[in-house]
A protein has these predicted regions:
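HDAC/HDAC-like amidohydrolase catalytic core signature
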Residues: 1-275
Length: 275
């Protein structure tokens, strides 16, 4: 996945992100590519076939390059996410998944790896209720579009607002979706308060058997793509709270575009998940 799915010299989502993480952590397990059947649990078959057939470098939207090796990279990302829910691990993958809509890619995303993993757990592992907590700085519009009408999956998104992709604003929550829009400049205290007052009671009421974290790190104070102020300690605290709310937790890498800080932020989250 490091060298698959090339995005060009000036795109923020590059293989250098994953290379830095693999060098730092030397993961013990590898996942194989997701099957077409698994991907089509969340994506339209016509869109899946279009990605599989890409024969030259192109763009799925103005932000999302794709080419002949994108199919392999996106299948591996989804397959690693599926493996993570089986073993309670953290899937270090690219490209990100949470912006991808059922019928098209967008926002750097090709396939919704977290949603694919959730449906895999339900179809193949006997899990009934799954929660997805997304702390990437961007609203997880793709994941929401996939699961909004599914009462067996709760989606929670904490994100900068207003900001790309322009969804997930105030008054957009319902029985299966909790959107928590936060203003630019929000840091550890704001996220901790949101967890205490909104995320925790909602998760306790839903009582998930599995919690999947869409772990983006672009809300970090030094990330170049956004304007939030979360620190490593803030990510550690959110991860720890997730483990307190569900006995079975897995995580999938989403955004985070400062290659120099990304390994430390993932490490902080791993410490929280292990606490």
């Amino acid at each position: 996945m490091v060298d698959l799915h090339p995005t060009g010299d000036h795109h923020p989502e590059t293989g250098a992100r994953l290379a830095a993480l693999l060098a730092a952590f030397n993961p013990e397990l590898e996942g194989g590519p997701a099957s077409v059947e698994a991907i089509e649990r969340v994506h339209d078959g016509e869109y899946v076939a279009r990605v599989a057939a890409l024969g030259e470098e192109s763009w799925l939207d103005g932000d999302t390059p794709a080419g002949p090796t994108t199919w392999e990279a996106a299948r591996l990302a989804a397959g690693c996410a599926m493996r993570a829910v089986e073993v309670g691990g953290f899937a270090l993958v690219r490209p990100p998944g949470h912006p991808a809509l059922p019928d098209r890619g967008m926002g750097f995303g090709i396939f919704g790896s977290a949603a694919i993993a959730a449906r895999h757990a339900q179809a193949e592992r006997g899990i009934e209720r799954v929660a997805i907590v997304d702390w990437d700085v961007h609203h997880g519009n793709g994941t929401e579009a996939i699961v909004r009408d599914d009462e067996s999956i709760l989606f929670v998104s904490l994100h900068q607002w207003p900001y790309y992709p322009g969804t997930g604003g105030p008054d957009t929550s319902d029985a299966t979706v909790l959107n928590i829009p936060l203003p630019a400049g929000s840091g550890d205290a704001a996220y901790a308060n949101a967890f205490r007052s909104l995320v925790e009671p909602t998760l306790r009421s839903f009582d998930p058997e599995l919690l999947i974290v869409s772990a983006g790190f672009d809300a970090h104070v030094d990330d170049p793509l956004a304007s939030m102020a979360v620190t490593a300690a803030g990510f550690r605290e959110m991860a720890a709270r997730c483990t307190q709310l569900c006995p079975r937790v897995a995580a999938v890498l989403e955004g985070g575009y400062n290659v120099a800080t990304l390994p430390a932020l993932v490490e902080a989250s791993l410490e929280g998940f292990a606490s």
